[in-house]
Amino acid sequence: LVLDPTLLLTNDIWERVFPIRNMFNERYVLYYRLLRNSFNEKQVADFAQRLGCKLLILEGRPRPTIKKDTISSANPIEFISLIKYADFIFTSSYHGMVFSLIFHKQFFASFSENSDRAESLLTSLDLKDHLIPHKSDIPTHIRKIDYTSIGLKINSLRSLSEKFLKESI
């Protein structure tokens, strides 16, 4: 397994390379919606409310937006910033999940199909319970991600990936 190139950089490097800043002055849960209806929006809104957070929806594909607190598109710096400063993330995007890992965020991911690489990565990190079947209810019990242990696993996978890439050149 070679990590996705996004994971070859640490969060420190991402923060040095990009001018990441908090775009909102309040706590929020981010729902990065690449696929429509990956999560029940009402359940996500209730979840955000229980955390005492605003719900922000980031559309993965530009769409005409009429709903309040919906962002129709974001450039790469805005995308990374939205993830870094979120209190919790719901995503139907592989890279939404990866950046959640990079910035040590609590998250749930859901994919309708082609979830093999997400499932493989989350299994290798012992986080498969954070991969929710498409259109399933949000679990009531959430196992908090221990990023001390996850960081060690990602660093180990990063080292193996770098070694493989160097030996392949």
Across the structure, where does each feature detected by a protein language model lie?
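Active-site anion-handling motifs in enzyme catalytic cores
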Residues: 1-169
